[in-house]
Every structure is written in C-alpha cells, then in structure tokens.
C-alpha cells in the first residue's frame, strides 16, 4: 500500500507532500529519512532508485530538478510504485512546471496538489489495479532493474545514490510501455466505476425527453 508522497526540488526545498492522517511513528521516521536522503543527492545520483527501509520501501524519480518520492509498504509492487510516480510527475509538471525554478517559491507552496495525490493514491491502492499487475509483469521486466539500496548503508555507512549504470535504450522503452499499460488499467477502472452512473443518467434524460419534449 502507498503510504505517503513527497515532492522536493533538488536543492532540498519541499514543494508538496500528501496530507497523511496516519500517525504511525514508523511512517514519520521514514519521512525524516527522506529529508536526509534529499540532502545527499549529487549530480551523479541515479535518476530512479528504490531504498529499502525496514517495513517500507522509498521509491523516487528525479526529473527537471524535481524529486518525486513515494513511501510504500515493503510488499507493494515496485512497478506499480514507479508507475504512480510517473503519473504524479506528469501532472505536477503540467500544473506547475513554469513556476518551479523561481527563486521566490516558498516551502510547500504547491500543497493544493494534494487533491490529485489523494485521488491517484486511492486508484493505485485499489486491489483491482494491483491484480492486473501479474500479466504486465510477465511482459515488462525492465522497471524491476531499478537500482536498490539499503537505508542504513546510505545514512550511516557512506554509500551513495550514484548511478550503477545508465538504463539502456530498450529498458527506457520498456518503462514507457509499462506506464502506458498501467495508465490504461487506471482508465478502465474509472470506466467501471462511473459507467453505471452515466448509463442511469442517460436513461433518465431520455425518459424525460420521451415523456415531455418529443
């Protein structure tokens, strides 16, 4: 399950974070570790990685000077976590891309983006979406090759997030294919949720037209 989402500028400025009702002390500890990780980024740090941290995994992607981070339970599918991050990145860039590099941006200035975070998290935590992962995982293995590090090594043993190797062109293409497939699953889920309502509404309008307006 996705537990928390955080968005930072690479210089450490927090731009947005999900408003989590969960007061679990262990989750709060993960958020503290995320802030430390952000301070360790260098120009050579990997653009995508997973950091194992106790019962959680911290997944992140970096793009256009912004770092998108999700804290998920250890058993949550990694491919789904990175697809979630890709959706978050795309919408955040579309909504605020022109404002992110300004020097007068305040901490958590884009907190209103939490509305999108909550809606998207609800979709990605839906068991029906996760159930469709099996077939995708059989065809698309590339995202699983994301670099994995341990939080203790990063914080206390001098390890870094530097790239182990660049993703190959084919791997990047597989990642794009995966995200497109996952987005289709999300769309199909929304259709299944709202199609009955739309059908009932259409029937009601048609009935009114038939009785009074024709």
Swiss-Prot record:
Membrane-crossing residue ranges in chain numbering: 193-213
A GO-annotated cellular component: endoplasmic reticulum membrane
Ranges facing Vesicular side: 214
Residue ranges constituting the Longin domain according to the UniProt record: 6-117
Name the UniProt record assigns to this protein: Protein transport protein SEC22
Gene: SEC22
MF terms (GO), sorted A to Z: SNAP receptor activity
Database matches in Gene3D superfamilies: 1.20.5.110, Longin domain (3.30.450.50)
Taxonomic classification: Eukaryota, Fungi, Dikarya, Ascomycota, Saccharomycotina
Family label: Belongs to the synaptobrevin family.
Source species, domain of life: Eukaryota
Topological type in the membrane: Single-pass type IV membrane protein
Cytoplasmic side: 1-192
């Amino acid at each position: 399950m996705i537990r928390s989402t955080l968005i930072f500028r690479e210089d450490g400025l927090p731009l947005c974070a999900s408003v989590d009702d969960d007061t679990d002390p262990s989750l709060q500890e993960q958020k503290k570790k995320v802030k430390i990780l952000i301070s360790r980024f260098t120009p050579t740090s990997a653009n995508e990685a997973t950091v194992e941290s106790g019962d959680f995994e911290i997944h992140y992607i970096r793009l256009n000077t912004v770092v998108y981070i999700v804290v998920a339970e250890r058993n949550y599918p990694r491919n789904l976590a990175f697809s979630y991050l890709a959706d978050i990145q795309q919408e955040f860039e579309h909504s605020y891309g022109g404002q992110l590099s300004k020097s007068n941006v305040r901490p958590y200035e884009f907190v209103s983006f939490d509305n999108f975070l909550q809606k998207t998290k609800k979709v990605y935590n839906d068991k029906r979406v996760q159930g469709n992962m099996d077939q995708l995982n059989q065809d698309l293995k590339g995202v699983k090759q994301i670099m994995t590090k341990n939080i203790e090594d990063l914080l206390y043993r001098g390890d870094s997030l530097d790239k182990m190797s660049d993703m190959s062109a084919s791997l990047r293409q597989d990642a794009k294919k995966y995200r497109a497939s996952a987005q289709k699953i999300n769309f199909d889920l929304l259709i299944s949720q709202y199609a009955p309502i739309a059908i009932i509404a259409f029937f009601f309008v048609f009935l009114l037209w038939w009785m009074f307006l024709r």
